[in-house]
Regions:
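Short, positively charged low-complexity motifs
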Residues: 5-8, 19, 52
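Intrinsically disordered, low-complexity proline-rich regions
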Residues: 8, 24-26
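Short, positively charged and aromatic/hydrophobic N-terminal segments
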Residues: 19, 24, 35-37, 41-49
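Cationic, low-complexity basic patches in intrinsically disordered or flexible, solvent-exposed regions
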Residues: 31
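Active-site helical microenvironments for divalent-metal-assisted chemistry
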Residues: 46-272
Length: 272
């Protein structure tokens, strides 16, 4: 009887663990069939506790993989340079990629759950525009990722880049519609990387460097509530989180810019 009771308890615990994995990884069934041949890996995922890292732990992994991260960075810079893509007032597009990854460096510990996800997170940041802007296909990105990462890591990294690729559309709204945002919400780390992308764009546009970015600043301001709502899956899984610290950094950029405009007398309420 004792053995039977223990078996029931263990079975119930395993069932609860399986349930937590479905919450942890919404497309777990697809993932299961993709990696069904690697039973040991599946067991490790099921039994692995979901947690985020301390900042020092994340920083130690950044230092450990610094050479690989730099190689990924250089390859992404060269890719966008090869299609003559620039950013803002004729800056190299790598300037933007570095800003996006700075957000990952600053806040990645708030979403990253294991060492094996560190490199895919950085790859996703550096290659997030590779399909949309640099003429790569999904399979092209996967091939590049396999040159730096394991098969499992390459899949995760490529999924992030794919999720952040705009849809076909005539307008900005069509290119970033519900299908696009749903893809972000369903992909591990994609909401966070997209938030870092928006933080980078807003930080630059609020610097007042050129007329186009001044225009985009107003677009980003108007989009902000809708944007945050659309990329937030409201998940308990840390990999899908929008860290409050990152959102606050973004808000600080807009507040600082508003205060600057007020000092310069450029806000609409001056004179009333």
């Amino acid at each position: 009887m004792l053995f039977s009771l223990m078996s029931n308890v263990i079975s119930m615990a395993f069932i609860l663990q399986i349930y937590s994995v479905f919450c942890y990884f919404p497309n777990f069934l697809e993932f299961f069939f993709c990696y069904a041949h690697d039973f040991s890996y599946l067991c490790r995922i099921i039994c692995e506790a979901v947690r985020t890292m301390e900042r020092k732990e994340f920083e130690s992994y950044m230092q450990k993989y610094a050479d690989q991260i730099e190689e990924i960075r250089q390859s992404a810079h060269k890719l966008h340079q090869s299609v003559n893509q620039t950013y803002g007032d004729q800056l190299p597009y790598g300037f933007h990629l570095d800003m996006v990854v700075q957000g990952i460096r600053d806040f990645g510990h708030l979403v990253c759950v294991r060492e094996a996800d560190v490199l895919p997170l950085f790859f996703g940041g550096y290659y997030h525009d590779s399909i949309e802007d640099a003429r790569l296909t999904y399979n092209d990105v996967m091939k590049v990722a396999r040159g730096y990462l394991t098969e499992e890591q390459a899949f995760l990294a490529t999924e992030i880049a794919y999720a952040l690729t705009n849809d076909k559309g005539r307008t900005r709204a069509e290119r970033a519609g519900e299908k696009y945002y749903k893809g972000i919400r369903l992909t591990p780390y994609a909401p966070f990387v997209k938030l870092c992308d928006r933080l980078a764009n807003i930080s630059y546009s609020c610097s007042g460097v050129d007329s186009n970015n001044l225009r985009m600043k107003e677009v980003y301001k108007a989009e902000m509530p809708h944007f945050l709502q659309c990329i937030n899956p409201h998940s308990e899984d840390p990999r899908f989180l929008l860290p409050q610290e990152t959102v606050l950094r973004l808000a600080e950029c807009l507040i600082d810019d508003l205060e600057r405009e007020e000092r310069e007398g450029k806000v609409w309420w001056v004179g009333y």
